[in-house]
């Protein structure tokens, strides 16, 4: 399971011109599900994201987590995080989970994050979405539950 995490002042996701998810101070998570992912990947990544100390404390040092600041979370599915561009000019998505499995694991990930009693908003799985955000910092991180990078 892969995630691009962006610390944001605000973010929203729209489908067909309608806002389906919107947050203020918190994290935008673009989430990709791989073909070998399972519940352990969900547990690892949810815990890691919720507890990452990437928000400024009173001294301006990144020392606080999403929980510490009572931040919000916007989770958007993005299978293209498994795009392999090493051969040719068209990405291969053979490492992505099939849509039915990916949707199930995506929903389980969202529920795992909701267990932390934070505001959690989402995009619409499989839809063509427009994501808008104000990146704070900017702070952008890449995570992989298999620790590939």
UniProtKB/Swiss-Prot annotation:
GO terms for biological process: D-amino acid catabolic process. Keywords: Cytoplasm, Hydrolase, RNA-binding, tRNA-binding. GO terms for cellular component: cytoplasm. It catalyses: glycyl-tRNA(Ala) + H2O = tRNA(Ala) + glycine + H(+); a D-aminoacyl-tRNA + H2O = a tRNA + a D-alpha-amino acid + H(+). Its main location: cytoplasm. InterPro entries: Daa-tRNA_deacyls_DTD, DTD-like_sf. A motif (Gly-cisPro motif, important for rejection of L-amino acids) lies at residues 137-138. PANTHER family: D-AMINOACYL-TRNA DEACYLASE 1, D-TYROSYL-TRNA TYR DEACYLASE. A Gly-cisPro motif from one monomer fits into the active site of the other monomer to allow specific chiral rejection of L-amino acids. Belongs to the DTD family. This is D-aminoacyl-tRNA deacylase. The lineage of its organism: Bacteria, Thermotogati, Thermotogota, Thermotogae, Thermotogales. The gene is dtd.
